[in-house]
């Protein structure tokens, strides 16, 4: 189940991912809640059914119901915010950036867990979703709260590995490689 099962499902050509998945979930500067919340948020953001099923089951062994809800909330809000703010960043007409967003995001103010944890999870989802504007905002908030670059890097590493695992497993399940 979980990490072990995903490592078994990864094809031989993804041996590095197999090793990285083991490393990022066992050797981290993130505390247990930060780590498994980052794993869950990243799995949701990565949109891989098998990866989400496996990692969610394991994450729920490590997270309180409140933390699991907050991780899901971070993934949901970032799915919206990352599209919106990435689009504003990419549009040539910067007037859009000065307009009121008009999007509800009350959970960011009161996520039900430590604000640092929620910010780390939002950062991870933003990394998966590729929103530079959001990444900068979350990194700035975390650094302002005294979080080290090493901790931030660990959250980004978890997100990148979980995303790569999801992409690889889902594509391999759809079209098994011959080599």
Swiss-Prot record:
Main enzyme class: oxidoreductase
Entry-linked InterPro entries: AhpD, AhpD-like, AhpD_core, CMD-like
One protein family per Pfam: CMD
Transmembrane segments: none
Tagged with keyword Disulfide bond: yes
Protein keywords: Antioxidant, Disulfide bond, Oxidoreductase, Peroxidase, Redox-active center
Enzyme Commission code(s) on record: 1.11.1.28
Homology family: Belongs to the AhpD family.
Function: Antioxidant protein with alkyl hydroperoxidase activity. Required for the reduction of the AhpC active site cysteine residues and for the regeneration of the AhpC enzyme activity.
Record protein name field: Alkyl hydroperoxide reductase AhpD
Species the sequence originates in: Parafrankia sp. (strain EAN1pec)
Gene: ahpD
